Amino acid sequence: MQKHYTVAWFLYSAPGVDPSPPCRSLGWKRKKEWSDESEEEPEKELAPEPEETWVVEMLCGLKMKLKQQRVSPILPEHHKDFNSQLAPGVDPSPPHRSFCWKRKREWWDESEESLEEEPRKVLAPEPEEIWVAEMLCGLKMKLKRRRVSLVLPEHHEAFNRLLEDPVIKRFLAWDKDLRVSDKYLLAMVIAYFSRAGLPSWQYQRIHFFLALYLANDMEEDDEDPKQNIFYFLYGKTRSRIPLIALFQKLRFQFFCSMSGRAWVSREELEEIQAYDPEHWVWARDRARLS
């Protein structure tokens, strides 16, 4: 019996031997390693749950109807992370982008070379459309679409300057029946000046008759009266025949400078006349002759 106690005492007192139970030391060691690994791993942030907001769906009078809408938690960086997880060496962009960009680049270089060879044509901007209040009745408002006119004061000044031309004066005095140059046709001349895109000081006698001839093409069915424009411009000699062909060519160029916008609304004509309602030109009304 004493021998067994001596062996036990020897085992417990031996250097380097842990007197604690072996199972406890092994379990504590594993628990320690697991806690260290858990501390090394970064904590994963949980994505915020999608929130719900209230948005205005319909506004009727003084009542407002709200609609519940879910806000998506997807952000741009999520798309960026998704693209980065693709197979290495794979371009997330479309495969034909470089080829299309190359062809687009070549086309752009060719267009720049063609622009250097040909002079640039300055076109007049197209008129914009706005909505204006036409009638207000109680809490209801009636809107009407209205075209914004591009006629500026300098276009009226160019028109008034050309009225002092002696040839134009004789032509207007000759047209007593107002078959070629009534107030609406003359107002269209001002509208064409604003659409052609030329500076006001460049408009000359030929531009006045080109615009007036084109206005007759748009509004008048009788072709004979406007042929008298050639008589006041070139006379009655045979040498005027090539000049008439040149006039028709210039008329087409003038039409193209307006981008083919030769139609003028009645509202715009009245607006042009309202700029200076006391002008003597607006007294050329066919209704007063009958």
UniProtKB/Swiss-Prot annotation:
Residues 36-50 have a biased composition (Acidic residues). Transmembrane segments: none annotated. One of its GO terms (molecular function) is protein kinase binding. Belongs to the Speedy/Ringo family. This is Putative speedy protein-like protein 3. Signal peptide: none annotated. Residues 16-50 are annotated as: Disordered. InterPro entries: Speedy.
